[in-house]
Amino acid sequence: MTIRSVEELEDLLSTPSPALIEEMAQLKGDILILGVGGKMGPSLAKLAIRAIREAGVDKKVTGVSRFSEPGLKGELEGYGVETISIDLLNDEELQTLPEVENVIYMAGKKFGTTGQEHSTWAMNTYLPGRVGEKFKNSRIVVFSSGNIYPFMPIGSGGADENVAPDPKGEYAQSCLGRERIFQYASHKYRTPLLIYRLNYAVDLRYGNLLEIAQMVNEGREIDLTSGHMNVIWQGDANEIALRSLSICDHPAKILNVTGPETISIRWVAEEFGKLLDKNPRFVNEEASDALLNNAGQCHRLFGYPRVTLREMIEMTAHWVAIGGESLNKPTHFQTRSGKF
């Protein structure tokens, strides 16, 4: 599979599976996406619109954001997504949002946390309390992070949902705070809810694979200390988020979302080296542990991701070779301190 343009990439990301189309046909009510302006939100909204259209049902998708990125609001509206431009932390504005049956909560702050901890905690932990109360009668899929888990031994298969959280650093702590506050709302109001613990969605414009490919292509050193990772194609991650609306429950269900492999960064870099005709440069040796998730429960519910690791590697190498667009949003996936 080769992607030659942003338009082809957006088309791939927004192509629904037959299973998603069927579930959108059965799902009752409209969909509200809070925090639609991030890396994943626009393609999730477009995926929802396409699935609804192909299902032949009448359902609105509304995206909520400050829309600070020029052109995004108009782009989404042109696709059929209704938009509402507000600051979610402004409670008066939050209360003006329409009541809907289905909410996908994507709002959050990660990068720039160090030195702005108060802002991160407000967005990641205070706001969920206000949202949980406002939408207590809705189904809610809450985007969270695999960062809430402890580092796991490389041979462990990663942390599954039964592993106790042990967040490192204030970002991860605030993410666990978000989960706990939404769980409180679920208990208090009997709100059906799913906590969606994602680690490392990628498309060709951002993510771990792009960063490794760029380092190989540019001859930069690759630090192998955090030498293993998980990834999942953003289109698959978005599809799982939408399909998770149908399994929200009380008390809140927890679901790890990532690909099936524990991936060696050394191996990935060497594969990029072959495809880009470059010799990867490595420093340090692999630690015995890393931030790894086990998404076996997710795969049992929804099947394996449609886009494979090998396809992601080949598409990313081609994208880098042709000088494809980058969002210039580093993931800092090699960070072990928990500081972002």
PLM-predicted stretches and their roles:
Residues 2-24, 309-340:
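Amphipathic terminal alpha-helices
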Residues 30, 102-105, 110, 126-170:
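Conserved Rossmann-fold NAD(P)-dependent oxidoreductase catalytic core, especially the SDR/UDP-sugar
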Residues 30-50:
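N-terminal Rossmann NAD(P)H-binding glycine-rich loop of SDR-like oxidoreductase domains
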Residues 42, 67-71, 75-123:
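NAD(P)H-binding glycine-rich loop region in Rossmannoid oxidoreductase-like domains
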Residues 53-71:
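Conserved glycine-rich Rossmann-like NAD(P)H-binding loop of the short-chain dehydrogenase/reductase
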Residues 121-125, 157-179, 202, 230-231, ...:
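Short-chain dehydrogenase/reductase
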Residues 176-230, 234-236, 272:
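NAD(P)-dependent short-chain dehydrogenase/reductase
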Residues 240-297, 337-338:
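Mid/C-terminal beta-alpha module of Rossmann-like enzyme folds, strongest
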